[in-house]
Amino acid sequence: DEVIYQKVGFLSNFTRIYIGKQTPYVLNKIKKNLSQNKSIITYANTWKLIKKNKYYFYQDKKFQIKINTKNIHSMGLLNNLCHAIKIALDLKIEKKIIEKTIPKITFEGRFQYLNKGKIKNSLHKNEKIMLDGAHAEIDAKNLASYLKSIKVPVYGVWAMMKNKEPNLFIKQFKNIFKKVIAIPIE
């Protein structure tokens, strides 16, 4: 409750506020905290992420935009991208510019594969290294979902600060990693 209050309790009045996808519990708390705010508030129920065949699309009442990307591998990040598309459309950015930009978008340190450099060059040609700076339970669920979809042995090198609830985080990866190496953070 305190975190929600800190994030939304001090937002300006008379502006535009966009609220991304939330659990019903968190969404209710956000709505209570914003009940006196005079801003225009847009919630994530004004758009949706849909899947047709093997492709994902942003969709609202006016637009359907194909999410043409090889850089985003998580439902959470796809939802974040849809949220950004909604904001861009509201800012009157043209659909064709958004479509042209989507393939270039990356979330640095989130589901990011190393594609060049000394470490990449030292790997076997069929091996890949992925980095992810996830630190919350929902991030772990998204990462675990993606890792389950790739059909190769997965090894993890993991470090997390105690104040980030590592037990809740790591339990999302049960039966996913062939081996996990834990590194202390000092």
Regions found by a protein language model. Name each.
Residues 1-2, 63-179:
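Nucleotide phosphate-binding/pyrophosphate-handling subdomain across enzymes
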Residues 1-100:
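Acidic, Mg2+-coordinating active-site environments of NTP-dependent enzymes
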